[in-house]
Amino acid sequence: MIALLILSLTCSVSTYRLQGFTNAGIVAYKNIQDDNIVFSPFGYSFSMFMSLLPASGNTRIELLKTMDLRKRDLGPAFTELISGLAKLKTSKYTYTDLTYQSFVDNTVCIKPSYYQQYHRFGLYRLNFRRDAVNKINSIVERRSGMSNVVDSNMLDNNTLWAIINTIYFKGIWQYPFDITKTRNASFTNKYGTKTVPMMNVVTKLQGNTITIDDEEYDMVRLPYKDANISMYLAIGDNMTHFTDSITAAKLDYWSFQLGNKVYNLKLPKFSIENKRDIKSIAEMMAPSMFNPDNASFKHMTRDPLYIYKMFQNAKIDVDEQGTVAEASTIMVATARSSPEKLEFNTPFVFIIRHDITGFILFMGKVESP
């Protein structure tokens, strides 16, 4: 049997304007083919959304389509996004922190209207040819606590603009696993069977068997203490089909189908860390912003900027007490005149989900914990 773990920090009642925001991150996730995956759909979508605000022409049209937004909905969607972020509250047992930084080279002329509207969200001026990596890492670490978010492979002397967002989540299970009951047990995947530390808890949880095109999957919700955040776990024989079926609306629908049951739940402890170049994924959704001849960010500057790099670093640790997960998404731009450089038991899926807004902060797949 193949298992899917969805660690989802999402809001179950997404407004129609933000469903496309969530779906953009899900589509990006579906284009990742690794065995073990941890990814932040929220981090990806947030970077794309913040690049939409200064975009114009075909670049704006493509990004609006990516977010499934009409032009007149952009302002209200931004307001709803900021409102949704306010609902990701930190409590005694759960800590959620999100940051956004836009670093623009001193040589780029920013329009006063753009600066006035967005500087309060974290707009910085610097010289990318003078120790930019250390300066940016210092600012990001001061704001987020995350260190060494960027390196010299991400930024170079051609860089003129970098958009960086971070997300950090730490949650304690509402129903913790008893550490004294963790035992070595078998986990079977396509490569064979291995021994892993398997956690165990007997408690009442919300779960159900859901059916997708005659395929059945067992889904269970593991809530975090004192927060509207849950981990959803799903397991079945065809997890590729399950992943292909995921949308923001379907996650809402499936979550409403879950009922209270007493489970003897066994889940392996696991840690995953991924560092990936996601430019090719974003390029499929909004190709013009990566094209030196077609990109346009004229709502921010008349300089001929285009995106030439995009990365996401993410990691997650799941144990008997709860979950710690973090991700940073980095989008890097240069000017057209610069030479372009190209930087080339069973498996399960996880989604970390805020149960009020629909934002998917993390999702992934574990083939070998």
UniProtKB/Swiss-Prot annotation:
Its main location: virion. One of its GO terms (molecular function) is serine-type endopeptidase inhibitor activity. Coiled coil: none annotated. It is a peripheral membrane protein. Keywords: Host cell membrane, Host membrane, Membrane, Protease inhibitor, Serine protease inhibitor, Signal, Virion. GO terms for cellular component: extracellular space; host cell plasma membrane; membrane; virion membrane. It comes from the Viruses. Induction: Expressed in the intermediate phase of the viral replicative cycle. It is found in: Virion membrane; Host cell membrane. The keyword Signal applies. InterPro entries: Serpin_dom, Serpin_fam, Serpin_sf, Serpin_sf_1, Serpin_sf_2. Residues 1-15 form the signal peptide. Pfam families: Serpin. Negatively regulates superinfection and syncytium formation in infected host cells. Acts in concert with OPG185/A56 protein at the host cell membrane by interacting with and inhibiting the mature virion entry/fusion complex (EFC). This mechanism ensures that new virions released from the cell cannot enter already infected cells. Interacts with OPG185/A56 protein. PANTHER family: GH10112P-RELATED (PTHR11461:SF211), SERINE PROTEASE INHIBITOR, SERPIN (PTHR11461). Belongs to the serpin family. Orthopoxvirus OPG040 subfamily. This is Superinfection exclusion protein. It comes from Vaccinia virus (strain Western Reserve). The gene is OPG040.
